[in-house]
């Protein structure tokens, strides 16, 4: 009952105390607020003053920097103005100098033009003076021409009166005389041109051929057909023949070669048109003689083995020659046929070595004259390939070889060059003429070929017979071992121009009707002798 009363008292005391404290605070605030406002005002004033001084200091600093920049700019402007002034003065001086030079050059040019104009005026005056002189001379020439025409007419009339010939008759006589003189002059000019052409051609040919031969260093040995086998003793002849001729019959049947056993001491002769079979027989007979066992069985064995050896030798020889000539891609059959030429000779010259020599010469000459080197050397190497089988096939060896080359895949250019190297076909290409040339060079050089005395005499007689078969020929002589024919003609039957035609006709007939190694020179000699006696 007493607790609520106490509580009320406490609340009353607390309220009174709080009321007294609120009043003190109000009074304090009344005095503090003005002081606070005054302090704030003073602080603001001080801050403003400080800020103002700072701003003024910055302004003064900026103004100082601006003055410095202004002074620097003014200094640069002055420098630029000075430099611009100097540059303007320099440019002005240069311009004035150029103007002076241009004026001087213009003055010189005007002076030159003035001199040229004066010279031109003088030349014009000279030309006009010369033109007047020419016109005067033309009038004089015209007058002289008229006078000459009158004189010519008078002379013509006088000549017609004296000679009793009309103008047409006199013209015919003069034309005949001019025609004869022209014909003689033409023949003389033809001889001069042919002489010059021959000299130039010979000079160029000598140069090309000498260069080619100098570069061609192939070895050469003249071979002949070997048909005699030496025997150690005469007793071996009986062993070769054998009992009742068994051995010799077996040998001849197996080799196809005839063995001639005669009175020749210590030697037998082998006879066969096929050089390969003859070589097989020779080697086989030598082996049998060394071995000592000579009977049909042994003969068959040795001949068979020798045939294989000769086949291998021919193949190796063909490959060797193709390699030395640098001719690639040959058919194996062509290689074999090339090797067969090892045992073939022509006028004592080995045909295989002759073919190799022709190939090397053709390659060098083709390189010098710009021809096809591969075609030239291949055709030259194969040009006598027909001789390997010409005893088996009918026809000229050139055409036989061309057909073999065509059948074994050689190009038409090579086939044509092979066929034309003896004029069985007309040469149409440079390479064909080149093969003809190297064939003549290889076969015609001294010591390359030889022939028997009978054939030599018959060939000389045939040359003289061909030359004397023409009309107007007095005599003909084959000289220089048949390499030149000198034809003596009747001077009243053949003139100088006819001598040229006769030389060509004789050479052409020799080419068509005779066979000969190398080339033959035809010389026509026409001699006129006038004889008189002083009494």
Curated annotation (Swiss-Prot):
Subcellular location: Cell membrane
GO cellular component: plasma membrane
Entries under CDD domains matching the protein: HDc (cd00077), KH-I_RNaseY (cd22431)
Domain of life: Bacteria
One annotated GO biological process: mRNA catabolic process
Listed NCBIfam families: HDIG, RNase_Y
UniProt protein name: Ribonuclease Y
Originating species: Roseiflexus sp. (strain RS-1)
């Amino acid at each position: 009952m007493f607790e609520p009363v106490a509580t009320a008292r406490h609340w009353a005391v607390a309220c009174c105390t709080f009321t007294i404290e609120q009043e003190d605070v109000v009074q304090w605030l009344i005095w503090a607020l003005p002081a606070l406002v005054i302090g704030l005002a003073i602080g603001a004033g001080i801050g403003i003053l400080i800020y103002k001084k700072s701003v003024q200091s910055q302004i003064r600093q900026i103004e100082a920097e601006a003055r410095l920049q202004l002074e620097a700019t003014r200094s640069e402007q002055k420098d630029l103005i000075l430099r611009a002034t100097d540059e303007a003065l320099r440019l002005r001086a240069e311009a004035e100098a150029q103007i002076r030079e241009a004026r001087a050059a213009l003055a010189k040019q005007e002076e030159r033009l003035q001199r040229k104009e004066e010279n031109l005026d003088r030349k014009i005056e000279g030309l006009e003076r010369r033109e007047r002189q020419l016109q005067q001379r033309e009038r004089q020439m015209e007058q002289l021409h008229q006078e000459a025409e009158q004189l010519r007419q008078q002379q013509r009339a006088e000549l017609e009166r004296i000679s009793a010939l009309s103008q047409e008759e006199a013209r015919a006589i003069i034309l005949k005389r001019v025609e004869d003189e022209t014909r003689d002059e033409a023949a003389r000019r033809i001889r001069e041109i042919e002489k010059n052409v021959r000299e130039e051609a010979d000079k160029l040919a000598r140069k090309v051929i000498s260069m080619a031969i100098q570069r061609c260093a192939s070895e050469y040995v003249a071979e002949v057909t070997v048909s005699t086998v030496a025997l150690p003793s005469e007793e071996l002849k009986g062993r070769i023949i054998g009992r009742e001729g068994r051995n010799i019959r077996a040998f001849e049947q197996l080799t196809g070669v005839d063995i001639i056993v005669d009175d020749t001491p210590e030697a037998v002769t082998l006879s066969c048109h096929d050089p390969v079979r003859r070589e097989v027989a020779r080697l086989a007979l030598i082996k049998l003689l060394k071995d000592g066992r000579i009977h049909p069985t042994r003969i068959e064995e040795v001949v068979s083995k020798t045939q294989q050896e000769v086949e291998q030798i021919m193949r190796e020889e063909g490959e060797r020659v193709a390699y030395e000539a640098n001719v690639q891609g040959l058919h194996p059959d062509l290689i074999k046929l090339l090797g067969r030429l090892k045992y073939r000779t022509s006028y004592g010259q080995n045909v295989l070595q002759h073919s190799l020599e022709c190939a090397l010469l053709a390659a060098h000459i083709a390189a010098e004259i710009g021809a096809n080197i591969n075609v030239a050397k291949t055709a030259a190497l194969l040009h006598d390939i027909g001789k390997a089988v010409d005893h088996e096939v009918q026809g000229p060896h050139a055409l036989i070889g061309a057909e073999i080359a065509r059948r074994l895949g050689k190009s038409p250019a090579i086939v044509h060059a092979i066929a034309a190297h003896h004029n069985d076909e007309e040469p149409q290409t440079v390479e064909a003429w080149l093969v003809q040339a190297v064939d003549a060079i290889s076969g015609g050089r001294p010591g390359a070929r030889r022939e028997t005395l009978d054939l030599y005499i018959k060939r000389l007689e045939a040359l003289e017979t061909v030359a004397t078969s023409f009309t107007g020929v007095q005599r003909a002589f084959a000289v220089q071992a048949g390499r030149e024919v000198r034809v003596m003609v009747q001077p009243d039957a053949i003139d100088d121009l006819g001598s040229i035609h006769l030389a060509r006709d004789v050479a052409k007939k020799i080419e068509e009707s005779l066979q000969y190694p190398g080339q033959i020179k035809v010389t026509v000699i026409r001699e006129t002798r006038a004889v008189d006696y002083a009494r």
